[in-house]
Amino acid sequence: MLRLTLFGASLLACVCGFAAQPNAEYDAKFVKMEVPKTVVADQVFSVKITMKNTGTATWKEARDILPSSLRAVSPENNKTWGTDFIIQGQGTMVAPGKEFTYVANLRAPSEPGKHVFQWRLHATPGLFGETTPKTEVTVTKREGPAEPKVVIPAAKDGKRALTFDDFEYAGSFKIPETAGKGGAGFSEFGMTLRNTKDGKRLFLNYTHPEGTLCEVSIPELAKFEKGNVTGLKSAEVKKVWGTLINKDKKASANGGMVWDESKKLMYWSYYHGYWTGGDLPVLNATKLNDDGTMTATGSWTVPQQKWHWGGVMRLPKSFADKYTGGASLALGYGGYFSIVAPCSRGPALSAIADPDPTAGRVTKVVNLLGYPEGTAAPRPGDFFNANCTFWNDQPKSRTTGMWSYCDHCRAGVFIDLADAQGYIAFAKLGTGRLGYDYGTITNAGESQYWYFYDTRQLGEVAKNSRKSSSVLPYQVKQDTDMGGMVTAAVFDDEERKLYVLRMSAYAAGREFHPLVHVYNIKK
């Protein structure tokens, strides 16, 4: 064993191995390994492990079952170092007789002490070849504060800043399994409220297998506890409208939406899952006619389109009159979309005036919240980046990190009541090992969070007295018990009720279906 120093770090270079069977199809010889001798608890660090292909089969890249990847051993498939595998990488092949160096970031455990570090190759038949030497790495105690301090903004003008504890869970209900040609299983729903002579309804937009807008009743609520949906009632379909599609039939609704009763207009949004081209029709409007038909009314491109792909909402009149010159439509919600440079690295929101149906572009947006390139929203540090080159800042601790390429925001609500205020962005954050593996973004796990922002600070951004990236959430709260990703939320200011739709919230046969959870704001 030879002690080396690389980039100022103390490393162990191991050049020994164990005997392997000759002439096997899959076989490998250990060559060398570079791993820090000592790391701090929770530290993210880089390793290099070189193996030689001594078998007869070429090691090809792995996409489905991870052949020719390194797997943790002692014991097998342990996740002491944040993950149990290190991939070979996209576009790589290792012919017989050739060496290959596996490079990855790993994460130290939280517990101080000596921990075993050992790996072995894995292919279609299973583990094969020599293991790396059984090395002990010392993990030292991390010094510093355990959690960031939460400071709730002071009340002003009789309005307190809302926190997670202000929301009292009232109950939940199911979404209809089908409506027209829409199915609940894979749909990324949009949702908004409508007042009718028969009471309140929800508009829901299914996106799979075909887009379908419908109106549903709001049933009696029951509690969703420990994943049990037995007592939950299902909303009843009252009317099926059909597919929301823009005038040139090049975009259909797949984001958020908001209903304008006075104009009988549904404003809805569109985003593209993988887009490198020019402007797309982010905002669209469809008139719902009294005879049950729909008329495509307007379609608009907008500046900073990837900041605004998530959805559309209506701002409270009190806020719009004070800060945005009366502009009361808002587009958002930010976070990751493919090709990230133009995206907001965190929640985003901008105000616009109701657009002219004859115009094809919104020319003026009033930014309220967003994180341009070079800035980022905060997030918990319960993750690490294994191999990606964008939005890849490693966390400083288990509690402190920066928005990553596995973090999404598809819904938000703006609340301005007589006694309380706040903007809430609903974010899905990747956890554990995050990777860009064979052209696919992956994460070991995910958690849903509520981000609470002071609307007065958003107003300061609108007035150009504050940069949007300087607005930070005063509370980031994990919502652990409700399952699934939030794709829609709407606030009923008359009844002080918040409706939150989470897709894939419970198992329904071979599919996962959504639930709507309802919360009352405490007085």
What residues fall within each predicted segment?
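Short acidic, flexible loop segments centered on an aromatic residue
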Residues: 56-79, 121-122
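Sequence/structural signature of beta-propeller domains
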Residues: 148-523
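Beta-strand-rich interaction surfaces with strong enrichment in secreted/lumenal proteins
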Residues: 35-37, 86-94, 105-107
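Beta-sandwich strand segments
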Residues: 125-133
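Short beta-strand and strand-turn-strand segments in soluble, beta-rich domains
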Residues: 27-30, 73-89
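Asparagine-centered strand-capping/turn motif at beta-strand->loop junctions
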Residues: 51-55
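Short, surface-exposed loop/turn segments at beta-strand-coil junctions that are enriched for proline
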Residues: 107-113
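Low-complexity, acidic Ser/Thr/Pro/Gly-rich terminal tails and inter-domain linkers that flank the onset
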Residues: 21-39
